[in-house]
Amino acid sequence: ITVIGCGGIGGETIEMLARMGIGELVLVDKDAFDLSNLNRQTLASIKDLGLDKSAVAKEKVRLINPYVKVTTFNEHIDQTNIKKVIETSDIVIDALDNVLTRVIVSRAAKEKGIPYIHGAIHGTMGQITVFLPNSEKTYEEMFNLPSIGKELNEETIDALKNVTSGVPPVIGPTPNLIGCIEAFE
């Protein structure tokens, strides 16, 4: 299973998957923990501030269940690296915080023929959607995104970046609940 995003949603998802005994995890995140993460990201602690989220996640998995094989990618996902990141995966879990990367990941999962589990939060609200390879609608169609059927060129990317603006405050239980449900799916 590949989990893309090791922050609020992803941290909880990763911990639950490790506790459930999932044998192999691929963890992806380019960010490092900072002080603002402590209120909602269960993998974050004072001693981890400034450290790469994917590296911290790997160590936490090792402490929970040393039998889980963990591979990490400390990089941003884009069209050039997504296939490499998910090449060994049977499932991709989206714990991302931006629409453009979700489109890239969802397209790659559909092309590979594997489930894409989407999770997102906004303030005190959250959502989960599971897209199977044979799902009637894609992620882009479900949310009526301006990228439907289009190449991800500069114009389409700009349109996707304009879909969401501003990040509302998030309290800890919201990403943790969504992360647990993603692991359950």
Task: Cite the ranges covered by each PLM segment.
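Adenine nucleotide-associated cytosolic modules
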Residues: 1-185
